[in-house]
């Protein structure tokens, strides 16, 4: 008789994805971040669900409801800080996951890669909407500034912004709809994760060498289940250390001041995980140009598979491309730093140079270096 896990219609799906799935024998810890992102999403949905039970999406009571959660709800402080810092953990894992894909050439699985980029956009949209909900100063002014960027769209811009706001400024209608979308999007993300995995399992995983591993596969369980569980423990330990020892380390003290439309904070900046894109936005002195650069800074990942000129898939055996990759990482860290600084000399010019370098590396230097490596290897 066939084992139930191989014959039952539902259990069979789980079996093919988590138990009997053939996986390359040499995938490193960089392949752990996919499962870690799944854990992050689960943590965010669970903590968010319990927070939503006590939160009120009304401008008059939103700030006080968050205070009430922290002070009066059993372990409400823990839920709130797990959710806030869980978002930071989510983005750390996301950026490492995308970085792994770039380094090892996983983007050659174009369907998986493109669904992943749509997921990245969806997570960014969700995080932005979530940041507005506590209705502090940074929430209100962040929502005002970022939604206002859409007014740069020619002809329909102003109407579009007022349509999103539900009025002539960020107000009660805006907060209510942002809460609705912030609640809805994670479930759409969860569905898209399934599509992401569906496309991945069509091709199988890549591996550090970039060479097909059809002849050297091992079952996912127990080898990679135990490896993933170790990753879960390490990540959750890091998250709990952050939440229990310094919960406000990555936040902004201005958000403990209730939203006041009559008082603009001296420096309006997003959470740390958006600073690199914010720096690119600010580096162009034209509003529409800045918005286009902001969108393209993420959208550019979509054309990375087209720009792949190397005869090798992975960067493992390509030292010149490796140097460029780490230059790109350093450049993104520089942009993150610049995004948090005021708009004054020398930060303006550093931001502009870092932005030019970012697009140059991806569009020009990487493809040319790959061609040069092909030539050096006489390919």
From Swiss-Prot:
Instruction: Relate the assembly described in the record.
Output: The cytochrome bc1 complex contains 11 subunits: 3 respiratory subunits (MT-CYB, CYC1 and UQCRFS1), 2 core proteins (UQCRC1 and UQCRC2) and 6 low-molecular weight proteins (UQCRH/QCR6, UQCRB/QCR7, UQCRQ/QCR8, UQCR10/QCR9, UQCR11/QCR10 and a cleavage product of UQCRFS1). This cytochrome bc1 complex then forms a dimer.
What's the protein name? Cytochrome b
Recorded GO cellular component terms are:
mitochondrial inner membrane; respiratory chain complex III
Keywords attached to this Swiss-Prot or TrEMBL record, sorted alphabetically, are: Electron transport, Heme, Iron, Membrane, Metal-binding, Mitochondrion, Mitochondrion inner membrane, Respiratory chain, Transmembrane, Transmembrane helix, Transport, Ubiquinone
Q: What is the effect of changing residue 138 to M?
A: In strain: Isolate Durban5
Q: In UniProt terms, what function does this protein have?
A: Component of the ubiquinol-cytochrome c reductase complex (complex III or cytochrome b-c1 complex) that is part of the mitochondrial respiratory chain. The b-c1 complex mediates electron transfer from ubiquinol to cytochrome c. Contributes to the generation of a proton gradient across the mitochondrial membrane that is then used for ATP synthesis.
The record, for InterPro entries, names: Cyt_b/b6_C, Cyt_b/b6_C_sf, Cyt_b/b6_N, Cytb/b6-like_sf, Cytochrome_b, Cytochrome_b_C_euk/bac, Cytochrome_b_N_euk/bac, Di-haem_cyt_TM
Residues annotated as binding a ubiquinone: 201
Q: What is its subcellular localisation?
A: Mitochondrion inner membrane
What cofactor(s) does the depicted protein rely on? heme b
Query: What membrane topology is annotated for this entry?
Result: Multi-pass membrane protein
- SUPFAM superfamilies in UniProt: a domain/subunit of cytochrome bc1 complex (Ubiquinol-cytochrome c reductase), Transmembrane di-heme cytochromes
| The organism's place on the tree of life at top rank | Eukaryota
Q: What else is known?
A: Heme 1 (or BL or b562) is low-potential and absorbs at about 562 nm, and heme 2 (or BH or b566) is high-potential and absorbs at about 566 nm.
Query: Membrane spanning segments where?
Result: 33-53, 77-98, 113-133, 178-198, 226-246, 288-308, 320-340, 347-367
Q: Which PROSITE patterns match?
A: CYTB_CTER, CYTB_NTER
